[in-house]
């Protein structure tokens, strides 16, 4: 099956005027994802996740925040020396000691961040904008003088005056030739329209690649990330299973599949998404919700009779993309909403064949059982019902066996 047969392309994009995407992914699961309350990854776990991200074709991996602890620093360094194709990045405050730690870790990119919003300047730093920007410039100069590529990140950018961001970014671009400037929607206040405006304004003001880092406090992190890409953002930040501070970050699995379906970007190995999701779920102790896009338990689970009957003929009738595209599996469930045609297809798929009268009897048993138990039935339960129906439909004068589950 060709790539194009695995999903339905959003052909309405052909009528939308947007800038062709020039993007790369920076996955921040190992740093921002680990800031999820209660989550601590071991060295072996971080190495395993980094290896999977690299094998998928993720361009940049943010491995951690070296000054957090000696163990963190050791892990970041080990990841940086694995020989991955992915470039390795780490976080740094606008402090010389943090940059020294990054240098000792052998990373490719250091992300030096400050906040420039009035909120953070007043209540977090208790310092002026000039002071904080001066600290950032000193750290950036020190990093570039020592051969590091630099991403200058504006924390809380979405609550910072746009003209202030433009001025700061232009200054570091002109003075230090940084590789990236980054916009962080730290509290998830943006929507796709305001994201497009913010990124477009910065795009018109600088020649440096723009990064977008979205949080999901209003459930729009993935949509905002795509809006940023359309407006000219180069580097898109994600986490596996959307884990992260508070409500989490833009979801890697959602962003990669959306890039394929919406924009035809197919270079990432999306077949690893489900196994990577399961890995991070195991390591973090956080299971994605059952209706989570792409990797949730119900993402490819169908019960409605109309849906199942159509899927048995052509899965794309009710699936935007096939489960195989993301390493998942389809699950056809027998329940209250299952119709005869769908039920016949399901029982045939598990090796049973029923006459019309038997099928009618089975559908009635299925509906009674599911309504009594308030849930769908398992395959074992279905097979038991099939056996009961076959026994009851035998031409015999014996009393019909009462069915039970």
Curated annotation (Swiss-Prot):
Residues 23-274 form the Pyruvate carboxyltransferase domain. Its EC number is 2.3.3.14, 2.3.3.-. Pathway: Organic acid metabolism; 2-oxosuberate biosynthesis. InterPro entries: AIPM/Hcit_synth_CS (IPR002034), Aldolase_TIM (IPR013785), LeuA/HCS_post-cat (IPR054691), PYR_CT (IPR000891). Keywords: Transferase. PROSITE patterns: AIPM_HOMOCIT_SYNTH_1 (PS00815), AIPM_HOMOCIT_SYNTH_2 (PS00816), PYR_CT (PS50991). GO terms for biological process: biosynthetic process; carboxylic acid metabolic process. The keyword Transferase applies. It holds the Pfam family HMGL-like. It catalyses: acetyl-CoA + 2-oxoglutarate + H2O = (2R)-homocitrate + CoA + H(+); 2-oxoadipate + acetyl-CoA + H2O = (R)-dihomocitrate + CoA + H(+); 2-oxoheptanedioate + acetyl-CoA + H2O = (R)-trihomocitrate + CoA + H(+). GO terms for molecular function: homocitrate synthase activity. It is an enzyme of class 2 (transferase). Catalyzes the condensation of alpha-ketoglutarate and acetyl-CoA to form (R)-homocitrate. Can also catalyze the condensation of alpha-ketoadipate with acetyl-CoA to form (R)-homo(2)citrate, and the condensation of alpha-ketopimelate with acetyl-CoA to form (R)-homo(3)citrate. These reactions are part of the biosynthesis pathway of coenzyme B and biotin. Belongs to the alpha-IPM synthase/homocitrate synthase family. This is Homocitrate synthase AksA. It comes from Methanosarcina mazei (strain ATCC BAA-159 / DSM 3647 / Goe1 / Go1 / JCM 11833 / OCM 88). The lineage of its organism: Archaea, Methanobacteriati, Methanobacteriota, Stenosarchaea group, Methanomicrobia.
């Amino acid at each position: 099956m060709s790539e194009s047969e695995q999903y339905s392309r959003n052909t309405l994009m052909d009528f939308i005027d947007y800038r062709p995407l020039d993007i790369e992914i920076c996955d921040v699961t190992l740093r921002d994802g680990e800031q999820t309350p209660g989550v601590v990854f071991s060295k072996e776990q971080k190495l395993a996740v980094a290896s999977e991200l690299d094998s998928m074709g993720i361009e940049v991996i943010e491995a951690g925040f070296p000054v957090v602890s000696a163990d963190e620093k050791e892990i970041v360094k080990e990841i940086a020396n694995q020989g991955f194709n992915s470039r390795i990045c780490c976080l740094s405050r606008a402090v010389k000691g943090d940059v020294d730690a990054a240098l000792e870790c052998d990373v490719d990119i250091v992300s030096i961040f400050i906040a420039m919003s009035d909120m953070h300047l007043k209540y977090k730093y208790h310092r002026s904008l000039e002071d904080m920007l001066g600290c950032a410039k000193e750290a950036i100069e020190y990093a570039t003088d020592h051969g590091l590529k630099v991403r200058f990140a504006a924390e809380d950018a979405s609550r910072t005056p746009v003209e202030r961001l433009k001025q700061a970014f232009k200054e570091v671009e002109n003075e230090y030739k940084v590789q990236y400037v980054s916009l962080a929607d730290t509290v998830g206040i943006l929507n796709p329209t305001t994201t497009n405006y913010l990124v477009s304004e910065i795009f018109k003001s600088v020649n440096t690649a723009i990064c977008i880092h979205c949080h999901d406090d209003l459930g729009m992190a993935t949509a905002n990330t795509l809006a940023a890409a359309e407006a000219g953002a180069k580097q898109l930040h994600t986490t596996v299973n959307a884990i992260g501070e508070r409500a989490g970050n833009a979801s890697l699995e959602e962003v990669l599949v959306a890039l394929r379906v919406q924009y035809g970007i197919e270079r990432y190995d999306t077949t690893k998404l489900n196994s990577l999701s399961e890995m991070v779920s195991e390591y973090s102790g956080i299971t994605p919700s059952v209706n989570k896009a792409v990797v949730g338990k119900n993402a490819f689970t169908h019960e409605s009779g109309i849906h199942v009957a159509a899927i048995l003929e052509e899965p794309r009738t009710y699936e935007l993309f096939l489960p195989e595209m993301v390493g998942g599996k389809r699950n056809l469930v027998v329940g209250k909403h299952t119709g005869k045609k769908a039920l016949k297809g399901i029982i045939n798929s598990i090796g049973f064949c029923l006459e019309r009268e038997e099928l009618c009897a089975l559908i009635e048993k299925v509906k009674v059982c599911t309504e009594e138990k308030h849930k769908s039935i398992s395959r074992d339960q279905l097979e038991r019902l099939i056996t009961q129906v076959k026994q009851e439909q035998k031409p015999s004068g014996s009393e019909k066996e009462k069915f039970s589950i």
